[in-house]
Amino acid sequence: MCYGIIVMILFSLYKGLAPNSAIVGISIMIIIAIGIYLIIEYAIKKIIG
């Protein structure tokens, strides 16, 4: 479910800001960073819990 939301945000950003590649690049980097953080947080909870 979380990945679907991220993909939808990514797609809407790409559609809306396609001419401005810098904003798209920064947005993609932020979304990837959030995704990595969530994966790490999930893994830590799995290991500890």
From Swiss-Prot:
Predominantly, its location class is membrane
Where, per UniProt, does this protein localize?
Membrane
Instruction: Give the keywords, sorted.
Output: Membrane, Transmembrane, Transmembrane helix
Source taxon at top rank: Archaea
Q: Which residues cross the membrane?
A: 22-42
Q: Which GO terms describe its cellular component?
A: membrane
Membrane topology term reads: Single-pass membrane protein
Name of protein: Uncharacterized protein MJ0185
From which source organism is this entry?
Answer: Methanocaldococcus jannaschii (strain ATCC 43067 / DSM 2661 / JAL-1 / JCM 10045 / NBRC 100440) (Methanococcus jannaschii)
